[in-house]
Amino acid sequence: MASTTTCTRFTDEYQLFEELGKGAFSVVRRCMKIPTGQEYAAKIINTKKLSARDHQKLEREARICRLLKHPNIVRLHDSISEEGFHYLVFDLVTGGELFEDIVAREYYSEADASHCIQQILESVNHCHLNGIVHRDLKPENLLLASKSKGAAVKLADFGLAIEVQGDQQAWFGFAGTPGYLSPEVLRKDPYGKPVDMWACGVILYILLVGYPPFWDEDQHRLYQQIKAGAYDFPSPEWDTVTPEAKDLINKMLTINPAKRITASEALKHPWICQRSTVASMMHRQETVDCLKKFNARRKLKGAILTTMLATRNFSAAKSLLKKPDGVKESTESSNTTIEDEDVKARKQEIIKVTEQLIEAINNGDFEAYTKICDPGLTAFEPEALGNLVEGMDFHRFYFENALSKSNKPIHTIILNPHVHLVGDDAACIAYIRLTQYMDGSGMPKTMQSEETRVWHRRDGKWQNVHFHRSGSPTVPIKPPCIPNGKENFSGGTSLWQNI
C-alpha cells in the first residue's frame, strides 16, 4: 500500500543501484527494499531545484499515483521526503517500451494491435473512473512489465496528469506532446477526459501502420492539421486494415470532444471485444518496418533534448527550447512534452480579474469591489493629492455618492496590458484604461489613465492589494457649480477612474 513517509529516511530502507533514466531535475534508479529484497524503480527528485509551483506539481503527481491501482498502470509503492530530495518508489518495469518490443517481434498483426490498445484503454478507463486525466499519452509512456512474451502493457509518467470532477471541462493549461495534442487544447478551449481518447486514436493509428496521422516539420502546420482533423487512410498500407479498425480510429479522432468515444465505450467496440473474429491476423511487415523508422526518429530527438537538459541549467534549457510563445521548436514536435500554463494561462487570469474589478466599478457594485480587493488596499492617485490612501473608506465615498446613483452608460477598455508574474502567488499588471461615457449635454467623452495594479493570491483567490494611477483628473458628471450656464469639465474628481 502506498504511503507518505517523512519520519523514515529513504536510505534506511532502500539500497540504490544503477541509473535507469534521467529527467530535467530527477533521476530514476533501480533500488531494493532491504527488509524484503524486493526490487523497485526509485524516481529521485532534487527538491532544492524546484519552485513552489513545481513542489505543488510533485505533490499532485504523488497523490494521483497513490490513487491509481491497476494491472496496466505503473504502481507507486512509496513516497518519501528527505532534506533536499523526494523519492517516489514505483514498480520496476523491465520490458522497455511497447513500441520497441513490437519491432523486435517476428509476427505482428492487427489483432496484436487490438490487444495493445485494449490494455491502454483499460488503463485510461481506470484513470477516468478515478477522475484523472493523463494528458500525455504517447509511446514513450507505454512500457512492458517484463521481457516475457505477453507481458502486460503499463501506462507510466503521471507528471502532467490532473484531477477532474466527473465530466468537468475547464482550461487546465496548454500541456502535452505536440503530435498527440487534441483540437480542443490547441484551440485553448475547456477540456477534460476526451483529450486522452484523442491521443489513444493517434497511438492506434501508429500501431496499425507505423507512422502518425498528423505530421509536419513545421509546428504551426502540424497544429492546423490536428485542428482540422485532416488525416486519411492512404493506399496501399490501409487497404489491408479492417473497416472496424478504421471505424474505431474515426470515433477516437472526432474533432468534437462531446461526440468522441469514451474509454469505456471503446472497450466495447467490436474490434476490441470481438478481436478473434473481427481483427485481421495477417502479419504486417510494412508496419514493423515503418515503426522502426518512427522509433529511431523519436529516440534521436529525445536524446538531443535529454543532453540539452542535462548539460544546461534547467530554466535556461527551457528557454532555449521554446519559441517566444512558450511552444517548443518544431524539431522536437514529435515527442517532446510541453506544459505552458505557467505563463499564458496565469497572465490571462490576471487580465480577467482586472477586467472584473473595473466592471464592478462601472456597475457601482461596492460589494463585488470589496470581494476583489484586499481590505488594506493601498493606492496612489491624483484625487488623493499625492498621498498614499489605505483601506476602503476613500473608495466607499465615491461608490455611495456617485457611482451607485449614476445611470449613465459607461464603457471601459484596457489597452496594452502587460503582466509580470512575481512568484507563484503574486502578479503586477500595467495598462492604459480608456473610459467612454456621455456627459450632461449628451456628448460622448473619453477619459484616459495609466494604471498599475498589484495582485496577491490568497486561498486560491486573486485580490488587488495596491494600485497606482496617473493622469489628469476629470469629472464625467455635472459639477455643483456651472458658471455662465455652461458645464465645466476642466477640473474636479474622476468619479469612475479614481478607484
Swiss-Prot record:
Residues where N6-acetyllysine is found: 318
Subcellular localization(s) per the UniProt record: Cell membrane, Sarcolemma; Sarcoplasmic reticulum membrane
Catalytic activities: L-seryl-[protein] + ATP = O-phospho-L-seryl-[protein] + ADP + H(+); L-threonyl-[protein] + ATP = O-phospho-L-threonyl-[protein] + ADP + H(+)
Regulation: Activated by Ca(2+)/calmodulin. Binding of calmodulin results in conformational change that relieves intrasteric autoinhibition and allows autophosphorylation of Thr-287 which turns the kinase in a constitutively active form and confers to the kinase a Ca(2+)-independent activity.
InterPro entries: Ca/CaM-dep_prot_kinase-assoc (IPR013543), Kinase-like_dom_sf (IPR011009), NTF2-like_dom_sf (IPR032710), Prot_kinase_dom (IPR000719), Protein_kinase_ATP_BS (IPR017441), Ser/Thr_kinase_AS (IPR008271)
One GO cellular component term noted in the UniProt record for this chain: sarcolemma
Induction comment: Activity is induced in skeletal muscle during exercise.
Biological process, per Gene Ontology: cardiac muscle cell contraction; cellular response to calcium ion; endoplasmic reticulum calcium ion homeostasis; long-term synaptic potentiation; negative regulation of sodium ion transmembrane transport; positive regulation of cardiac muscle cell apoptotic process; positive regulation of cardiac muscle hypertrophy; protein phosphorylation
Modified residues (N-acetylalanine): 2
Tissue expression: Expressed in cardiac muscle and skeletal muscle. Isoform Delta 3, isoform Delta 2, isoform Delta 8 and isoform Delta 9 are expressed in cardiac muscle. Isoform Delta 11 is expressed in skeletal muscle.
Main location class: membrane
Region (Autoinhibitory domain): 283-292
GO terms, molecular function: ATP binding; calcium/calmodulin-dependent protein kinase activity; calmodulin binding; identical protein binding; protein homodimerization activity; protein serine kinase activity; protein serine/threonine kinase activity; sodium channel inhibitor activity
Membrane topology: Peripheral membrane protein
Family affiliation: Belongs to the protein kinase superfamily. CAMK Ser/Thr protein kinase family. CaMK subfamily.
Subunit structure: CAMK2 is composed of 4 different chains: alpha (CAMK2A), beta (CAMK2B), gamma (CAMK2G), and delta (CAMK2D). The different isoforms assemble into homo- or heteromultimeric holoenzymes composed of 12 subunits with two hexameric rings stacked one on top of the other. Interacts with RRAD and CACNB2.
Domain free text: The CAMK2 protein kinases contain a unique C-terminal subunit association domain responsible for oligomerization.
Biological role stated in the UniProt entry: Calcium/calmodulin-dependent protein kinase involved in the regulation of Ca(2+) homeostatis and excitation-contraction coupling (ECC) in heart by targeting ion channels, transporters and accessory proteins involved in Ca(2+) influx into the myocyte, Ca(2+) release from the sarcoplasmic reticulum (SR), SR Ca(2+) uptake and Na(+) and K(+) channel transport. Targets also transcription factors and signaling molecules to regulate heart function. In its activated form, is involved in the pathogenesis of dilated cardiomyopathy and heart failure.
Annotated protein name in UniProt: Calcium/calmodulin-dependent protein kinase type II subunit delta
